[in-house]
Amino acid sequence: MKRPAIIVPEDLGGKVLLHACCAPCSSAIVEWLVQHDIRPTIFYYNPNIFPFEEYEIRKNESKRHAESLGLSWIDGDYNHEQWRQDVCGLEGEPERGRRCEQCFTLRLTVAARKAKELGIKYFTTTLASSRWKSLEQIERAGHIAEQMVNGQCSMGNGVVFWAQNWRKGGLYERRNQLLKEFDFYNQQYCGCEFSKR
């Protein structure tokens, strides 16, 4: 029997905190979640994006998308200088290198904290929809974030990272259709100044 492309955790409970990197990457995931009676709270936390004007464009597109669907959208704030300190020494790493994994871990840890604060058990990320990103790095980062927020002894009561390949099930193709339908701004680089090389 063929395994379904999207595996929904049995105890999801109809809600998830979705860390969103941008509107284009979020669009098909959000559509799929809503169609399957899962209400995402969209959490926009991307201090890696540079310059600030680029960050504002992407943030506003993400917010516009969520508002058009009547979904909760949370601004995770922007502190690029702190992000630079957190990836210090990794500036020369290639895309999909150690800098990216550190960046994912930082962002997903903040997302996990937000999920815990809101009482949402599961969190996931749109980063896993990009063909330019390593799914293995994203999954590791999500599980590290889960452990950092829960501590060693969560006894099953903590937040859980929903590791999902959001490229599957036709979602990547649907993303490209929704990009045109919503007339989203579509960036040409991941976000940080080092990814522009």
Language-model segments: residues:
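Nucleotide-activated chemistry modules centered on ATP-dependent adenylation/adenylyltransferase
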Residues: 1-197
